[in-house]
């Protein structure tokens, strides 16, 4: 029986991908089942910012996640990929503030809190769909009905629940402590949002007069204090020296007079001081420096805050004790000349006034790192403010033990050390932010300033027995974004309700994320989850069993991708293509630093002179997987993307070749499998084994490589060719066997590759399924190929490998001797082993067909060969008689190269064996193997040299 079949010449991703995805989604293939007893598999996506768009890092991580999800779905697991977006407090608020400033010339204060928040919700509704549409374009098999947003009602309830419970347990408190303060945005920000920039600054050396006629060891009546922050000196409450610094031993415990403020402050000893820095004397300003804050706590120093929230000098200093409460009885007047000055104007005036008083000793150039807010773009100030904190140490201890005990594995393992180093030195976490957009802190204040914490105002009144006449005002602050995203794995599954989803899918299986948020997000998820989610035995649950840490996607030069560098690549542009003009507009439009536009445009024109061609989603996904070597940063490579687009085309063309073959016979009847049929099935079985083993170790690169190698090099380049003689000259049983092998291996190959390249595999599979008698609707729901223990055929593998070497040797002789592929050749074998002679005897017809040979002959031991071109395959010598077609000069040149190759190998092994250290350390078996190789190369060299002499004598 033969089948007529039509198939397009080329695979057109743009015509197929979106329609296929829509069908998958509408058919409900992405949804988990309701079966609570089925083995489950769950991944919670790291939620992207709701106002953003996907970048290459998202595409990279999501490709890996979808590969795992699709694989596990095909394995029969009840699979949930939980998706959603993050409200991203500060980022989203800034986007909308910039938008209303540009379009309406208004600020958020013109709107007021409630109206401005409504404006953000409008923006979220408008832009929030962008990310989910882009994720669909990537082929992500997500149950969209379960999509969550970190400010959904359900998640907001979970946030309030966690806050209230932690407060009731004494683990959340309000206090005045030092935070990173952004004076432009008027909010505390996390360390993650601080960018330390290299700066050419100064180190000022000021003289602080000693009080009460004290003198230094060398007779001076002042100490020289080195500082990079003159503007904060009005808040100094001590100067410090190292306890073992002999220069200042006699002065410890005495005082200096703080210039300009005319206030006595103590000289203290603390090991924090670096004796080599400046003069070895530093000013201590606990209200304006994180290190000084710790020194101040150790020595019970007052904290004198001299800056407003705008970073101007205050009219009156705020004086706070180490307990965070106002401190009475300590005088710290700010001189009138400095009140209201902007911080850097105050710096200039203070330096000038020191100089006028003769107290400026010297100014030295000094390189330093200045902390900037990554969004406000101005230097941040360590600032004493009232904030809410989580006391995380008790939570951290449990989270550390979970990783120590192996309940959570990091891949690669070295990231455990990074996790431990952070967690073992953990500080209380500032969770309040002075923003309008976010989860408002569930705390209320009465007129006297008493604080009441509860889930809502109604609960406050009942919990604290407050009369309805008592006026309450909710805290204005919102929670750090990381607080709500720390609940992500369980809040999205319905917690605090004990839902069936929570029972079925928690703990999740793997988290795929970047190393830069291990502390800010991963660690906090572990702490919160283990504190609040328990199994049926009351044991704390982990949020995930494995953390797979990816590297960054960089550009081709290894630079980090960023808008300011103009080197950002949009994954959708890799899929659909983009013109040079549109790419230039995308990279240079709406820039924060327009002066960089011309430089960026020039670099873009050079790199993408023709714009970017369309490659389709599968090529992008396959490239990302192939580049995913464990934990390393990845340099993006457009050539690899082009290469994998060609790979997709190769798979399409091979499928077309198989399915449109008019001689394909899938009828019932006798079958006779050839050596090639047995070989390709064994090779496929090995590929399945490699894929499964690699995926279990999160080696996505090895998975991609296994599929590429099998598809391109074994199936397309060899097996399809090996079947051509069968279809041309085989009997009915052989043709049936080749036909069955072709379509069944192709169908299984599509299933194997589907998790990585879902669109093209589904499109081809829909055409293949009828050939193999499958009536199912989608490849997604088919079982993933298993390793079949009986499916290995080492004998067939060895025989085909030998035949391939012979065929390649003959083809090389043709190429090197410029012999037309169509010209029939004779092939002689000399020194052929009994084992290979048997293969040759059985497979002569195949060899003749594949290598275009007229005659094949094995020479007797002492038989003289005619003048011939020779190649070695193992120990066997292949000879193609030269009569009538040899080019003497070309053949001598070829043999010279062969002689050099063999001489180099002989020399290399001789050097190895004459190396005493190698011989002393290497096992006997290794040395014996090297000697065996040496003898083989020496023998081969002699044969080629003989051949050279024979041709030279012509």
UniProtKB/Swiss-Prot annotation:
Annotated ATP binding lies at 563
Q: Which domain of life is it from?
A: Bacteria
Coarsely, its chief localization is cytoplasm
The molecular function terms of the Gene Ontology recorded here are: aminoacyl-tRNA deacylase activity; ATP binding; valine-tRNA ligase activity
Identify the Pfam families for this entry.
Anticodon_1 (PF08264), tRNA-synt_1 (PF00133), Val_tRNA-synt_C (PF10458)
> Does the keyword Aminoacyl-tRNA synthetase feature in the UniProt annotation?
yes
Which GO biological process annotations does it have? valyl-tRNA aminoacylation
Cellular compartments per GO CC: cytosol
Q: Where is this motif: 'KMSKS' region?
A: 560-564
Q: Which UniProt keywords apply?
A: Aminoacyl-tRNA synthetase, ATP-binding, Coiled coil, Cytoplasm, Ligase, Nucleotide-binding, Protein biosynthesis
Reactions that this protein is recorded to catalyse? tRNA(Val) + L-valine + ATP = L-valyl-tRNA(Val) + AMP + diphosphate
Claim: Amino-acid biosynthesis is one of the keywords in the record: no
Q: What is its EC number?
A: 6.1.1.9
Q: Give the coiled coil ranges.
A: 883-953
Compartment(s) where it occurs, according to its Swiss-Prot or TrEMBL record: Cytoplasm
Task: Motif 'HIGH' region — list its residue ranges.
Answer: 48-58
Where does the secretion signal sit in this chain?
A: none
Q: Cross-referenced PROSITE patterns, in alphabetical order?
A: AA_TRNA_LIGASE_I
Subunit-structure text: Monomer.
Q: Which PANTHER family match?
A: VALINE--TRNA LIGASE, CHLOROPLASTIC_MITOCHONDRIAL 2 (PTHR11946:SF93), VALYL-TRNA SYNTHETASES (PTHR11946)
Query: What does the UniProt entry state concerning the protein's domains?
Result: ValRS has two distinct active sites: one for aminoacylation and one for editing. The misactivated threonine is translocated from the active site to the editing site.
The task this protein performs is described as: Catalyzes the attachment of valine to tRNA(Val). As ValRS can inadvertently accommodate and process structurally similar amino acids such as threonine, to avoid such errors, it has a 'posttransfer' editing activity that hydrolyzes mischarged Thr-tRNA(Val) in a tRNA-dependent manner.
Q: Which HAMAP family does this UniProt record tie to the protein?
A: Val_tRNA_synth_type1
Q: Which family does it belong to?
A: Belongs to the class-I aminoacyl-tRNA synthetase family. ValS type 1 subfamily.
Q: What is this protein called?
A: Valine--tRNA ligase
User: What organism, scientifically named, is this protein from?
Assistant: Haemophilus influenzae (strain ATCC 51907 / DSM 11121 / KW20 / Rd)
């Amino acid at each position: 029986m033969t089948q007529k079949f039509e198939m397009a010449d080329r695979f057109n991703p743009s015509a197929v991908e979106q329609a296929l995805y829509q069908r998958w989604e509408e058919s409900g293939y992405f949804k988990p089942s309701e079966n609570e007893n089925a083995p489950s598999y769950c991944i919670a996506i790291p939620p992207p910012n709701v106002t953003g768009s996907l970048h290459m890092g998202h595409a990279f991580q999501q490709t890996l996640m979808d590969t795992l999800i699709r694989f596990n779905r095909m394995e029969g697991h009840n699979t949930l990929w939980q998706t959603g977006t993050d409200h991203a407090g500060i980022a989203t608020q800034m986007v909308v503030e910039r938008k209303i400033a540009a379009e309406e010339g208004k600020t958020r204060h013109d709107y007021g809190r409630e109206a401005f928040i409504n404006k953000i919700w409008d923006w979220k509704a408008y832009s929030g769909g962008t990310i989910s549409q882009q994720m669909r374009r990537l082929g992500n098999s997500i149950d969209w009905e379960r999509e969550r947003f970190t400010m959904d009602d359900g998640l907001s309830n979970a946030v309030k629940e966690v806050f209230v419970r932690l407060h009731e347990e004494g683990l959340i408190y309000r206090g005045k402590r030092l935070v990173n303060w952004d004076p432009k945005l008027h909010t505390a920000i996390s360390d993650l949002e601080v960018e330390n920039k290299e700066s050419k600054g100064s180190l000022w050396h000021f003289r602080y007069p000693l009080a009460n006629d004290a003198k230094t060891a060398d007779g001076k009546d002042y100490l020289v204090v080195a500082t990079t922050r003159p503007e904060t000196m009005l808040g100094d409450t001590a100067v410090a020296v190292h306890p073992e610094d002999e220069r200042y031993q006699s002065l410890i415990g005495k005082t200096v007079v703080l210039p300009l403020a005319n206030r006595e402050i103590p000289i203290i000893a603390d090991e924090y001081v670096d004796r080599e820095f400046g003069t070895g004397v530093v000013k201590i300003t606990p209200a304006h420096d994180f290190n000084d804050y710790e020194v101040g706590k150790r020595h019970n120093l007052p904290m004198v805050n001299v800056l407003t929230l705008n970073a101007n000098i205050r009219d009156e200093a705020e004086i706070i004790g180490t307990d965070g409460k106002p401190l009475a009885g300590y005088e710290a007047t700010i001189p009138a000349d400095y009140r209201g000055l902007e911080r850097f104007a105050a710096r200039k005036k203070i330096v000038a006034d020191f100089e006028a008083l003769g107290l400026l000793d010297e100014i030295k150039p000094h390189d330093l790192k200045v902390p900037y807010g990554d969004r406000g773009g101005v230097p941040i100030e360590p600032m004493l403010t009232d904030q809410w904190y989580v006391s995380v140490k008790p939570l951290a201890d449990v989270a550390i033990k979970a990783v120590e005990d192996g309940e959570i594995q990091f891949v690669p393992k070295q990231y455990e050390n990074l996790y431990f180093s952070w967690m073992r030195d953990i500080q209380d976490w500032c969770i309040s932010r002075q923003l309008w957009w976010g989860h408002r802190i569930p705390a209320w204040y009465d007129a006297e300033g008493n604080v009441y914490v509860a889930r809502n105002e109604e609960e406050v009144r009942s919990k604290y027995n407050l009369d309805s006449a008592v006026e309450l005002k909710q805290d204005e602050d919102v929670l750090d974004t990381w607080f709500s995203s720390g609940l992500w794995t369980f809040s999205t599954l319905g917690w605090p309700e004990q839902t069936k989803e929570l029972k079925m899918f928690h703990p999740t299986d793997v988290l795929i994320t970047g190393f830069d948020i291990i502390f800010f997000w991963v660690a906090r998820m572990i702490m919160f989850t283990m504190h609040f989610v328990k199994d049926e035995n009351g044991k704390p649950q982990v949020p995930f069993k494995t953390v797979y840490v990816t590297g960054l996607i960089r550009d081709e030069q290894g630079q980090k991708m960023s808008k300011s560098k103009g080197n950002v690549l949009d994954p959708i542009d890799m899929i659909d293509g983009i013109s040079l003009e549109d790419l230039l507009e995308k990279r240079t439009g709406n820039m924060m630093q327009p002066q960089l536009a011309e430089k960026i445009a020039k670099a873009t024109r050079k790199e993408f002179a023709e714009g970017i061609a369309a490659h389709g989603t599968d090529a992008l996904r396959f490239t990302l997987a192939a580049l995913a070597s464990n934990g390393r940063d990845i340099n993006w490579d457009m050539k690899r993307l082009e290469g994998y687009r060609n790979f997709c085309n190769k798979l399409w063309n091979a499928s077309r070749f198989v399915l449109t073959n008019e001689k394909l016979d899938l009828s019932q009847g006798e079958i006779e499998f050839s050596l090639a049929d047995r070989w390709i099935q064994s090779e496929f079985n090995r590929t399945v084994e490699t894929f499964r083993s690699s995926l279990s170790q999160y080696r996505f690169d090895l998975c991609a490589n296994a599929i590429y190698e099998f598809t391109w090099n074994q199936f397309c380049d060899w097996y399809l060719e090996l079947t051509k003689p069968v279809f041309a000259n085989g009997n009915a049983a052989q043709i049936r066997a080749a036909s069955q092998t072709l379509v069944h291996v192709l169908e299984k190959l599509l299933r194997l590759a589907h998790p990585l390249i879902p669109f093209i595999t589904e499109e081809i599979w829909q055409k293949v399924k009828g050939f193999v008698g499958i009536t199912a609707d989608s490849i997604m729901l088919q079982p993933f190929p298993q390793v079949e223990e009986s499916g290995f055929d080492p004998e067939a593998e060895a025989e085909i490998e030998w035949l391939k070497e012979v065929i390649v040797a003959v083809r090389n002789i043709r190429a090197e001797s410029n012999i037309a592929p169509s010209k029939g050749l004779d092939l002689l074998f000399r020194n052929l082993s009994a084992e290979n002679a048997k293969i040759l005897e059985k497979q002569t017809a195949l060899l003749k067909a594949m290598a275009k040979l007229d005659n094949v002959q094995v020479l007797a031991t002492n038989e003289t060969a005619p003048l011939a071109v020779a190649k070695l395959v193992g120990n066997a010598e292949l000879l193609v008689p030269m009569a009538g077609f040899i080019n003497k000069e070309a053949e001598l040149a070829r043999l010279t190269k062969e002689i050099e190759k063999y001489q180099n190998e002989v020399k290399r092994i001789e050097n190895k064996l004459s190396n005493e250290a190698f011989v002393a350390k290497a096992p006997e078996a290794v040395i014996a193997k090297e000697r065996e190789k040496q003898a083989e190369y020496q023998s081969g060299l002699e044969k080629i040299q003989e051949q050279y002499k024979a041709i030279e004598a012509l």
